[in-house]
Amino acid sequence: MKLIPIFLFLLFFSLSAQASFSFNTNCKQAYTDMMCLRFEQAAARMQSEKKLNPDNQVPFIIENYIDFLKVILGEEDRDFIHLKDNKDLRLQKLALHGENSPWFLYSQALIYLQSGVARIKFSEYVNASLDINRAYRLLIENRRKYPDFVMNKAGLGILHSLIGTVPSKYRWAVRSLRFEGTIPEGNSEIKEAYLQVASDPQLSFLLPETVFLLTFVTLNLSADVPEALNLVEKLNEASILQITNECPLLVYSFANIYSRAGENDKVIKLLSDYKFSPDKYPFYYLNYMLGVAKLNRLDADACYPLLNFLGNFKGKNYIRTAYMHLAWYYLIYNEPEQYKIYVERIKLRGNDQVDNDREALTFAQKNITPDLSLLKARLLFDGGYYARAKNALDGFRTADKVARLEYTYRLGRIYDNWDKKDLAIPYYNETINEGDKLPYYFAANSALQLGMIYEKRNDFMQARTYYSKVLDMDFDEYQFSISNKAQAGLNRIKGK
């Protein structure tokens, strides 16, 4: 879920025992309940805390977290309205006392930041920018007052990293808000926070959170999948993560990293082992992830998690994409009538906020049945089954220009991730030469991948050429995501 990594990082700002921000045993348990999406239990504990310790500010922060998570995970209008209605009241409560605590300004920044991200989710972009700007200012001021405060580093690290991904044509908006930041700067700040937490037994309960932040930046912004995978493997060795299966957000985080690393079997095992519980707020996106992972392995039961997601999720994002995957499933399993039904449903439900859903709608509107060899190769590649993906393309022949373009692109991607870079490069270049004037994403993503190959080889001139080429292309599919990654690449190699 491309938006979730950006949204969920806001969850992982924890609390400690300080003045009016007392993270006592009751609040720690409420926080754990919240992390595990046991919202009712967490809310009940916070009601009790307000009666026992009326000066403690922690309940207002945890209550806002709960409302925020409902908005992000459930995407329902009523929850969004509830979050907005309570924003000013909670800010007033947090500003009453505790001025000498680093949590005083930080907690207010979190309220604004969560409000801003929720507004983005519901397309209120102007108000979102105002909220995020206010959060940024509060974090900067708090850093001036408390330069060693660990969660300042985490919060600003994420914001600085995200600022560094803004494409050059939108940098004017960043400058107008006087935002500053780069991916290396943000990554460094989050690493500092992680090391500080890892070395202090008193902060050990923050370890999963800071690792989540670090893996988020490493995976999504620094584009270093092996490093992100290595971090997760290290975290899995820690006894602190025996509760992983109890925390859906951690399950999501690890599954996302395994997926990007081509460890699809691990994705399926992790998500299959997770058990939904009636005492937890339902995170239906995990069903979607499981269905996609199973389809990437061409499993015969891949349809069931996708149907579960579509039958229960009341939000709008990834609905069209789920229908597209179901259509592909029935095409692969030779049920043409079911295939047609789900192609039509793509047009009827969902929205176009995320790249995946826009691709699904375009797919349905074109009404062109995909070539089975290309489709299987795409899915198997997404699952990391590179030999099977290559075999699916053996014997592929076509006179269709777009299908041929996808064929060269798929071969480039397969060889690239199969660690056969020199075989991938000519296929990427052929895709760029044949498709840079077409609206499809194949040429742009080929240029992005070449930029990453040359960056890792320390050939920064070539890397800069290909990253810049992405930003010069005019294409429709996955435009926001691919352009952001290209801009992030340029920022990483700036001055090299």
Whereabouts are the PLM-identified features?
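Residue-level recognition of tetratricopeptide repeat
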Residues: 31, 65, 72, 110, ...
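Alpha-helical adaptor scaffolds
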Residues: 211-215, 219-220, 259-260, 371-384, ...
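Solenoid-like repeat scaffolds
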Residues: 20, 47-54, 98-99, 145, ...
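Alpha-helical repeat scaffolds
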Residues: 45-47, 79-96, 127-140, 171, ...
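Generic helix N-cap/helix-start motif at coil->alpha-helix transitions
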Residues: 20-26, 101, 149-150, 168, ...
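Alpha-helical segment of the N-proximal tetratricopeptide repeat
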Residues: 25-39, 371-388
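Short coil/linker segments at helix-helix boundaries
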Residues: 21-25, 33-46, 60-234
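Residue-level detector of the short coil/turn that links helix A to helix B
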Residues: 37, 123, 222-223, 262, ...
